[in-house]
Design a protein with these regions (language model features):
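Conserved GNAT acetyl-CoA-binding A-motif
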Residues: 113-125
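Conserved acetyl-CoA-binding loop-helix of GNAT-fold acetyltransferases
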Residues: 92, 98-111, 134-138
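Conserved beta-strand-loop-alpha-helix junction that forms the acyl-donor binding cleft
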Residues: 123-133, 149-153
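Acetyl-CoA-dependent GNAT
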Residues: 31-96, 112, 160-163
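Short hydrophobic/aromatic beta-strand or adjacent loop that forms the aromatic wall/cage
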Residues: 48, 152-156
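Conserved acetyl-CoA-binding loop of GNAT-fold acetyltransferases
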Residues: 137-145
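A short, well-structured alpha-helix characteristic of acyl/acetyltransferase catalytic modules
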Residues: 1-41, 60, 163
Length: 163
């Protein structure tokens, strides 16, 4: 069954909070704590889009696309060059993980970024999240180095879209 992406709305806060409180959350999302969805969702900026992944009308995941050079938080620092975007991708309920849904979501996210003219895409899974490392490599990303983001130690991966 096909996975579709639709823009996040305030109506999604309940499911996002549920996913954000999963017992294994810190293993894949880091130690920064839950997102402030009420503040994040209404922000309408061309450099950041947030999507809900659905399969058969059921919300199963979340993806955020962020143009690093325009991100006001400067999260990506020196990696924030024009044309570089970052992806945050979650599969919410653990029952949906490991069945190819993430690959479908990533393919759709890459299509969107290609349409936006992105030349490079970054992801930042935690160092200990070996499952995510294998996933990103299978999706065409290559590791480019370790980096600390707040208290979290991550392995940054990139995928070039301009080659």
């Amino acid at each position: 069954m096909r996975v579709d992406l639709r823009p996040v709305t305030l109506d999604d806060i309940s499911i996002l909070r549920t996913w954000d409180s999963e017992p294994d959350r810190d293993e894949w999302a880091g130690t920064d704590g839950p997102w402030e969805w009420e503040a994040e969702i209404p922000i309408d900026e061309p450099w950041k889009t947030m999507w809900i992944a659905e399969r058969g009308g059921l919300a199963i995941g979340f993806v955020q696309l962020l143009e690093t050079s325009l991100d006001e938080t400067n999260y990506w620092g020196e990696d924030a060059e024009k044309g570089t975007w970052a992806i945050d991708l979650w599969i919410g309920d653990p029952v949906h993980r490991g069945g190819g849904i993430g690959s479908q979501i990533m393919s759709r996210a890459i299509e969107i970024l290609d349409e936006c003219g992105a030349s490079r895409v970054l992801v930042d899974p935690l160092i200990a999240n070996r499952r995510a490392h294998a996933f990103y490599e299978a999706c065409g990303f290559a590791p480019i180095g370790e980096r600390s983001f707040g208290a979290d130690r991550c392995l940054v991966f990139e995928r070039r879209l301009d080659q």
